[in-house]
Regions:
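N-terminal export/assembly segments and adjacent metallocofactor-ligating motifs
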Residues: 1-248, 285, 642, 688-715
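N-terminal leader/propeptide and maturation segments of large enzyme subunits in energy/redox metabolism
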Residues: 84-96, 101, 243, 248-286, ...
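Conserved short loop/turn motifs at secondary-structure junctions
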Residues: 122-130, 281-284, 307-314, 347-348, ...
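Extended redox/cofactor-interaction regions of prokaryotic respiratory oxidoreductases
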Residues: 134-200, 205-211, 235-239, 328-448, ...
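Long, contiguous, secondary-structure-rich segments that constitute the structural scaffold
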Residues: 489-535, 540, 599, 620-635, ...
């Protein structure tokens, strides 16, 4: 502890230069992968950015995104002042206004709408970043609106949903102790440096590695076995592996017999998924399926590393991942050291080995006291199982229909309309609202359709609480004051709460006081955290035993791990809601729509990570753009390109029955023949507008971004 304190002093003077090193974290990526930063500050300006060597997650390293932090902070595109729209929506015509005028205008409008239409008519949306989400949800519920929505309507939570349907509580891979790791459609070398280092260390100590991924990646290059599954067929692959494990009696009979529900029906169902059938459905050779199943089932302990969203970005996504997670229970690798070990979340879904009052902070009003959430009737399992938020993918449908009640206003924090399928349709729907506010760091295309735009500051200009899985915690301090007239998201939420007249003590107390309230059960205070600006290990981490289910059972209706979901049994006969992890091909595929596939023979797979981008957050930065100079570009297998007469960087048209875009061709062996991969979010070539708005998984509401049908042709 003393060594960390010595290393992480808030202001370490660099002798003779006038430079002070101030500690922070990079918040460009997701909450569990935020690397430590050393910010070199001179005369109130950040002049250099380095990785913080004492940070236990990143240990001094930064990826290309974090290295470009200065360009992000000092971008010429930063919003400088609150703005009020003066021209038509989408015109980008605004005039500067004061903060008081902006906040008063919002509060008056929201309260008018609340009085006329009810609080549920106002929507509260969060994109990136995520640190303020508990505060925005508390604001929404204190206002009386159930309609707190986030970008998690397309990212990660459907994966958690599949785990909760199976076990009641997710278990993450114990990378330090596992002897066999099955990575399912994740590529941590592009997305999660800490996990990538753990894989390298595991390989050094002899850990076996199986990787399921349609693409060739740095992770697949390290694998003992690479299973190049056809996009959207993950469930069939998992069921075929289960077939081998059961047929060869490699499953854990004690766990299955004493701690599971529905195994007999599940076992009978997987009989149909022989390795040969698996090869037919997935394109993975039968012998590789058998080899992988034997390796995963026979080496103990073994763990599965899931991805945040690729497997659930299919119209059959949750059922696919249920089939994958069943392998954990089938082999008895749930909640054991070296397996998929259960560590409860401490803050923002991140396990921090401390107890907090986050749930009490965000759930201020019972759902029963509010109107049904957006999408509740259409996606009831999303509502029942996650019990967290509304399903944002239903937003445009309810705006247009006005059913079961009208939606009149929306405030977005970092909202990007291009995250929706049929993105143009979403923007057109938002423009039908009576009032739209967006808070952002930059003037985005979404902001151009807002009535009021508010400037947010970056993470290095404010404080933030962050927990890490290894029991590390940090409460950052501003390295520099907020630039221009920008403010923190939390400050904006507090100001709005006051002007809305909400009688909520914790929305009046101030950020640091609220963090103290949340952390109270841990015995850690903001004052203590400030002594360790680079972060600290929690002094009394929670001690977690293996197999906690032996005493507490499983948090499922049966109290057991469920091969056959009792939640889904309630929806018997509803397509896509089968209680067993039934495999069905994607809604648009050669199997489901053969006539459509004749005209649109390629699988369109979008959004898989590139190392220099995370969504669109670094598109405007010259350093990251220089690493992919030909973007927007579509990845095409060279064999397909040769057949179509397409050369590198030539213009190609990608079309679906919905729309078409023109991009450059990027020829690469990373993608399979018959598959086109396109990164998302480009204003000049928005691939998400090629998807129908209702191309969704019926269980989660997630879009099928990774397995639609398309045509590609040379322009």
């Amino acid at each position: 502890m003393k060594d960390v304190k010595k290393l992480s002093r808030e202001r370490m003077l660099v002798s003779g230069t006038g430079i002070e090193i101030r500690k922070s974290i990079c918040t460009i990526c997701d909450p569990q992968t935020q690397c430590g930063l050393d910010l070199h500050v001179k005369d109130g300006k950040i002049v250099k950015v380095e990785g913080s060597k004492e940070h236990p997650y990143s240990v001094g390293t930064l990826c290309s995104k974090g290295a470009a932090t200065r360009q992000y902070i000092y971008s010429e595109d930063r919003l400088k002042t609150p703005l009020k729209r003066t021209g038509p929506r989408g015109s980008g015509k605004f005039e500067p206004i004061s903060w008081d005028e902006a906040l008063d205008t919002i509060a008056v409008k929201f309260n008018e709408i609340k009085l006329q239409n009810g609080p549920e008519s106002v929507i509260f949306f969060s994109g990136y970043t995520k640190y303020f989400r508990p505060y925005l949800k508390r604001l929404a519920h204190s206002f009386g609106s159930p309609n707190y929505l986030t970008e998690s309507s397309t990212c990660h939570r459907a994966t958690a949903m599949a785990q909760k349907l199976t076990f009641g509580q997710p278990g993450g891979p114990d990378l330090k102790n596992t002897r066999c790791l099955l990575v399912w459609s994740a590529n941590p070398f592009y997305t999660n440096p800490g996990n990538a280092r753990a894989i390298l260390k595991g390989r050094e100590r002899g850990m076996k590695l199986i990787v399921v991924d349609p693409r060739e990646t740095p992770t697949t290059a390290l694998a003992d076995i690479h299973l190049p599954v056809r996009p959207g067929t993950d469930g069939a692959l998992a069921l075929s592996m289960a077939n081998v494990i059961i047929h060869e009696k490699l499953y854990d009979r004690d766990f299955v017999g004493n701690h599971s529900y529905g195994f007999e029906d599940y076992s009978e169902y997987v009989q149909h998924f022989t390795p040969e059938k698996g090869e037919e459905l997935t394109g993975v050779p039968a012998d590789k399926i058998t080899q992988a199943a034997r390796m995963y089932a026979s080496i103990k302990p073994a763990a599965i590393m899931p991805s945040a969203s690729p497997v659930v970005h299919h119209t059959n996504g949750v059922q696919n991942y249920r089939a994958v997670f069943d392998l954990i229970g089938l082999t008895g690798n749930y909640d054991i050291i070296g397996g998929n070990f259960v560590v409860p979340a401490s803050f923002l879904h991140a396990p921090g080995l401390i107890l907090t009052r986050e749930h009490e902070f965000i759930q201020t009003r019972p759902w029963s006291e509010m109107a049904p959430r957006v999408g509740a009737d259409r996606f009831p399992v999303w509502v029942d199982v996650l019990d967290e938020e509304a399903q944002a993918m239903h937003l445009p449908f309810q705006i247009r229909s006005g059913e079961p009640y009208p939606l009149k206003a929306l405030i977005g924090f970092g909202m990007n309309y291009r995250m929706w399928p049929d993105s143009k349709g979403l923007l057109e729907s938002v423009e039908k609202l009576d009032f739209f506010v967006n808070v952002d760091i930059f003037m985005t295309d979404t902001c151009k359709s807002a009535d009021i735009v508010l400037p947010a500051c970056t993470s290095v200009e404010r404080s933030e609480l962050r927990c890490y899985p290894m029991g590390y915690i940090i409460f950052t301090q501003p390295a520099i004051p907020p630039l221009y007239e920008s403010r923190s998201d939390v400050e904006i939420i507090y100001e709005l709460a006051g002007r809305l007249g909400l009688d909520d003590p914790l929305l009046k107390a101030g950020y640091e006081a609220s963090v103290d309230w949340i952390l109270a059960p841990s015995g850690i205070s903001v004052a203590e955290l400030k002594k360790y600006p680079g972060g600290m290990f929690v002094p009394n981490p929670i001690k977690l035993p293996e197999k906690k289910y032996l005493k507490a059972g499983f948090k499922t209706p049966s109290g057991r791990m469920e091969f056959k979901s009792k939640v889904l049994e309630r929806y018997a006969g509803r397509p896509g809601f089968e209680a067993l992890p039934v495999y069905t091909p994607p809604k648009h595929s050669k199997e489901s729509t053969p006539e459509l596939a004749q005209d649109y023979p390629f699988i369109l797979n979008t959004g898989s990570r590139l190392p220099m981008f995370v969504h669109t957050r670094t598109y405007r930065l010259s350093w990251t753009n220089s690493l992919r100079p030909n973007h927007p570009a579509a990845d095409i297998n060279p064999a397909d390109a040769a057949r179509l007469g397409i050369q590198q960087d030539e213009a190609v048209r990608i079309s679906t029955p919905k729309d078409a875009i023109v991009v450059k061709a990027n020829l690469t062996q990373m993608v399979q023949p018959g598959v086109v991969h396109m990164y998302h979010g480009h204003s000049e070539a928005d691939v998400n507008m090629l998807f129908e708005g209702d191309y969704l998984d019926p269980l989660s509401g997630y879009p099928g971004f990774k397995s639609a049908l398309c045509r590609i042709e040379k322009v």
